[in-house]
């Protein structure tokens, strides 16, 4: 039996650049550090459900447009 693990992925960078927001601007909008935004974009950190929803609102995206499992 294969040991498959689902990975939580995101399209945060694409959505952010589509809006022409820098990491710093988005971070300020949602109340986190620029490093947190960078870590989420690179998959080093998974946002809490609350932060994920705040990011969706800030970027005018549905949850499933920003976050998915692979």
Regions found by a protein language model. Give the residues of each.
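DNA major-groove recognition helix of helix-turn-helix/homeodomain DNA-binding modules
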Residues: 50-65
